[in-house]
Amino acid sequence: LGVDPGVRRIIKTKTEAMLVEQYKGKAPLLEANRQAFRLGYDWTREHVEPLGLKVERRDCVGDRIFVDGNSAAGLGAVYGGATVCAWYPITPSTSVAEAFMRYCRKFRVDKATGKHRYAIVQAEDELASIGMVVGAGWNGARAFTATSGPGISLMQEFIGLAYFAEIPAVLFDVQRGSPSTGMPTKTQQADLLCSAYASHGDTKHPLLFPEDPTECFEMGAQAFDLADRLQTPVFVMLELDTGMQDWLTAPFRWDDSRALDRGKVMSAEELEAGRDFGRYLDVDGDGIPYRTLPGTHPRRGAYFTRGTSKDRYARYTEEGAAYVDNMQRLLRKFESAKALVPGPVIDRAAKPTRAAAVWIAPTG
C-alpha cells in the first residue's frame, strides 16, 4: 500500500485519509497500518525511481455518489419508514441488513433522549426472521427481512400466512446462483417464480425489480407503502451484481416531508362513530379490506388473525361459499395492485419489428 502511491507520487495524505476511513473505530489496527504505509511510502520515495506515469487529480465523478445496491436498499428501507429488521445472514443479502443498521444509528436515534427507535434482530434462522417480520407487521410496524434463494425456500410457510391473513411485510431478495446452495458468489435471477408464487395454494405476490442503486433506494422505500396499502408481502428483487457491486450514481432524492402511505387503517374515531368493521369486508370493491392495529380502540375493531379459512368478519369457517368469496376478493386485490406498482420500462424499436425482448434487471 505504501509502495504503489510512492512510485506514482500520489499525495501521501490522501492515502492516509483512506486508511482512517477504513479503520474507523479500530485505533490499534489504524496505527499499525498507518506506520506500515509510511514505511513503504517513504522508502519508495527515497530508493525507487518514479514511473513514467503522471497521476493528476481530476473530478470525473462530479456530484455523483459511489454506492452499492444493497446499501441503497438499506437506506431506502429507512426512508420508507421501516423500524424493524429481522434477518439471518446469507450471501449476498447480508449487507442490506448491515446497511440498515448503519443508517438507523444515524437517522433513527431520538436526539432528545438518545433512545434508538428501531429494532434489528439477527435471528437463529430464516423461519424465525420472517416470523418476527410478520408479527411486527401485524402490530403496525414497518418490518422487513433480507435473504436470498435458499432463505426464500425456508420462509414459504410464513409468507403464505402473511398473504392469507393479509399482513404487510417486505422481503429484500438478493438473488444468487441456484438451485439448492448453488453458487453463492455468482449472480442469477433464480428466484422469480418461487417469489412470485411463494407458499402453497393460490398465492400471488407483487415483485419490484430495481435496475440500479437509485431504484434500489426508491423501490426499497416504495415497497413499504405498497405492503401497507395492499396488506400483503412485497418482494424487492435485487441480484448479486446489483446488490454487491459499487456503482456511480446521482445522489438520491430525500424529502423530509414525505408522508408514509399506511393504506386502509381504521382510526379510534371511526370505530367510536360506529362504522361497521369486518376485517375482510370489501367495502370499496378493490379487494383491499380495512384493518385495525392492536390497541386502537378498547372495545371495537378486534378480530382473530387466522391462517385458516374465514368469513368476512374473520370468523373461522369451512363453508365453500365463504372460501370462494374470500379467494375472489384476493384476486380483485391482486388486480388492484397492478395499478399501484411501477410499470415496465419500454424501449421501442426505431423501425417496426416482429420480434421483442423481455428482460428483468440490468443483467437479465
Regions found by a protein language model. Name each.
Residues 198-201, 349-351:
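Short, flexible turn/loop "capping" segments at secondary-structure junctions
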Residues 58-59, 66-80, 219-364:
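Flexible, low-complexity linker and terminal segments
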Residues 17-197, 204-205, 210:
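Thiamine diphosphate
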Residues 202-225:
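Active-site/ligand-binding-proximal alpha/beta "capping" segment
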Residues 175-176, 199, 212, 240-241, ...:
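A broadly conserved detector of short glycine/acidic/proline-rich loop/turn motifs that flank catalytic sites
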Residues 94-95, 178-180, 215-216, 243-246:
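Short, well-ordered, mixed-charge alpha-helical segments that flank or form enzyme active sites
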Residues 2-13:
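Positively charged, low-complexity/disordered segments
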